[in-house]
Amino acid sequence: MHGLLLAGLLALPLNVLAHPTESHSSGISRRAIDITSYRLPQISKYTKSDSLTGQDGQSFTASSADADTSSGDYVSTATNWLKKTLPNASYRLVNDHYIGDSGIGHVHFRQTAHGIDIDNTDFNVNIGRDGKVFSFGNSFYDGEIPKANPMVKRDFSDPVDALHGAIQTLNIPVTAKPENVKAKPVEGKESFKFEGTSGALSDPKAQLVYLQKDGGLVLSWKVETDVGDNWLLSYVDANDKGKVHSVVDYVSAAAYEVYPWGINDPTEGKRSTIHVPWFKTQSVDWHIDGKNWYPTTRGNNAIAQENPTGQREYENNYRPKSPLFIFKYPYSEAMSPPSSYRDASITQLFYTTNVFHDVLYILGFNEKAGNFQTNNWNKGGLGGDYAILNSQDGSGVNNANFATPPDGEPGRMRMYNWNASTPERDGCFEAGIVIHEYTHGVSNRLTGGPANSRCLAALESGGMGEGWSDFFATAIRLKNGDTRATDYTMGEWASNRPNGIRKYRYSTNLTTNPHMYVDADGLTSVHAIGTIWASMLYEMLWNLIDKHGKGDVSKVKPTLKNGVPTDGRHLAMKIVLDGMALQPCLPNFVQARDAIIDADKNLTGGSNKCEIWKAFAKRGLGVGAVYNPSKRTGSNELPAGC
């Protein structure tokens, strides 16, 4: 799950914000089950573009890095590269490959054994504009494959037993009485949908998979349950329903009289009426999905409504209607209760989310890359996955979260009210919270490919997920007069905390924010780790702004020349997005740094290499930095030439 928790606002197991002093406030955490102890292991490797080194000591020189392109397309090139790198591996091509706006082809593979997926093994190949392998990531299992094919003797438990095991072990609020539950086969090998349950937002599912764990493979049932605050993949031992090996959570704890884009919250400016704010090349119209024209806060990219009871249903929930598409409603900080300004809240949430969708589209998060749209207009990717936006959601307080299933399934944002002030405040009016949450959807779709939403499930990967979300929220709120001496908080207005919800402000001053890479040692909160990562990205942001300028931040639409943003602010965002698509599944800081440097190399020929390296090295992620989950090695070293 993804969200804001305070200091941790970003500390829930959802992609949520996180609160520094409060315990987890929703979902599984409410039931005293710590699913963070079930995280997937961090096993990925990333081979960057300027040092292609294969497995088993095999070195690829610049000339030998030319993959076989005789078959004519980037997917074949990637497939041949995998065959060359791991000639004995069994695998399948994941059907989510695409060529990004930066010209890089992204191809993803899943390892198999006896025709069964090894679910946490991934191989991603990035093909450059020249048709050659640019970089690749690998988490394939290199141990001995079990000799016995479990499908021959069907030596595994019934999927219904696995469902019961997940429910009982993790205390999932789903009722599945043995006499009522039936496992109905669906498309896919040993894949089932459970009928006769209650408590989940959709029918639970199960698929037989292997899981790479502790140096071996364990046959498991991957049980999927969406209960709102948690959308879980629980890997239950196929022969012992009481043993859960790992857990992934998809939830990562907007016409329009609104606070305009760039105004973070009511302390920074006034509401105004924005006319036709969408970018016509990115959104035909925010209220059209190709079949219908909705005179309400619904359209191709998002559907926004109130949800005061915190229920799972949303389509019939209240949302403002305007046959003339004039969404102007009263709001002031003094109004109370929140229900008295629900129309303004829903409209603000719909506006902020749609603008961010359009900005991200220009920067490369489009249909092929797995963005959130009902209709993909025949441009690739899977449609049917607008973002569900719940304003004033009654399932929690003092937080927010975003659930990110794979491409083709709608994402879901839950925005809560905050009660640390009188009257209480609505998180929909703090743009940074909305942007933070939506960015969880972006980072989960880009990392590991649109079809794989579990690639930020390891501790350090999940921490970077929180950091990317804070980074975008902060970069977007910059003002024309800001300099590298400007510091920013996160969640300050909603939480009513002058210093916000993070341990330190985001600052380039090491006295104000002393975070270093090695500070991640011993941390178990993704939100605390994320603050370190976002601090590094904030350094990079200002290095690029100092070199390229930040442009006129009052202009919403990014300006690109030959696919490259002309200002340093949007250039930083673009490089970060491209890096997400390059990096391996379950990356660590070092691998994500290398992917960002590779992204700039592909986008600009590496013209910003030193600015990027200086940002990371300043906070201990220089050339000599080494990842070790218990004792990281910091480095301030710069590469030659910088």
Swiss-Prot record:
<dbReference type="GO" id="GO:0004222">
    <property type="term" value="F:metalloendopeptidase activity"/>
</dbReference>
<feature type="compositionally biased region" description="Polar residues">
    <location>
        <begin position="49"/>
        <end position="60"/>
    </location>
</feature>
<feature type="region of interest" description="Disordered">
    <location>
        <begin position="49"/>
        <end position="72"/>
    </location>
</feature>
<comment type="function">
    <text>Secreted metalloproteinase that allows assimilation of proteinaceous substrates and probably acts as a virulence factor.</text>
</comment>
<keyword id="KW-0378">Hydrolase</keyword>
<feature type="binding site">
    <location>
        <position position="436"/>
    </location>
    <ligand>
        <name>Zn(2+)</name>
    </ligand>
</feature>
<keyword id="KW-0325">Glycoprotein</keyword>
<dbReference type="Pfam" id="PF02128">
    <property type="entry name" value="Peptidase_M36"/>
</dbReference>
<dbReference type="GO" id="GO:0005576">
    <property type="term" value="C:extracellular region"/>
</dbReference>
<keyword id="KW-0964">Secreted</keyword>
<feature type="glycosylation site" description="N-linked (GlcNAc...) asparagine">
    <location>
        <position position="602"/>
    </location>
</feature>
<keyword id="KW-0479">Metal-binding</keyword>
<feature type="compositionally biased region" description="Low complexity">
    <location>
        <begin position="61"/>
        <end position="71"/>
    </location>
</feature>
<feature type="signal peptide">
    <location>
        <begin position="1"/>
        <end position="18"/>
    </location>
</feature>
<keyword id="KW-0645">Protease</keyword>
<dbReference type="InterPro" id="IPR050371">
    <property type="entry name" value="Fungal_virulence_M36"/>
</dbReference>
<feature type="glycosylation site" description="N-linked (GlcNAc...) asparagine">
    <location>
        <position position="509"/>
    </location>
</feature>
<feature type="binding site">
    <location>
        <position position="440"/>
    </location>
    <ligand>
        <name>Zn(2+)</name>
    </ligand>
</feature>
<feature type="glycosylation site" description="N-linked (GlcNAc...) asparagine">
    <location>
        <position position="419"/>
    </location>
</feature>
<feature type="active site">
    <location>
        <position position="437"/>
    </location>
</feature>
<dbReference type="GO" id="GO:0008270">
    <property type="term" value="F:zinc ion binding"/>
</dbReference>
<dbReference type="InterPro" id="IPR011096">
    <property type="entry name" value="FTP_domain"/>
</dbReference>
<keyword id="KW-0732">Signal</keyword>
<dbReference type="GO" id="GO:0006508">
    <property type="term" value="P:proteolysis"/>
</dbReference>
<protein>
    <recommendedName>
        <fullName>Extracellular metalloproteinase 4</fullName>
        <ecNumber>3.4.24.-</ecNumber>
    </recommendedName>
</protein>
<feature type="propeptide">
    <location>
        <begin position="19"/>
        <end position="253"/>
    </location>
</feature>
<comment type="similarity">
    <text>Belongs to the peptidase M36 family.</text>
</comment>
<keyword id="KW-0865">Zymogen</keyword>
<keyword id="KW-0862">Zinc</keyword>
<dbReference type="InterPro" id="IPR027268">
    <property type="entry name" value="Peptidase_M4/M1_CTD_sf"/>
</dbReference>
<dbReference type="Pfam" id="PF07504">
    <property type="entry name" value="FTP"/>
</dbReference>
<dbReference type="InterPro" id="IPR001842">
    <property type="entry name" value="Peptidase_M36"/>
</dbReference>
<keyword id="KW-0482">Metalloprotease</keyword>
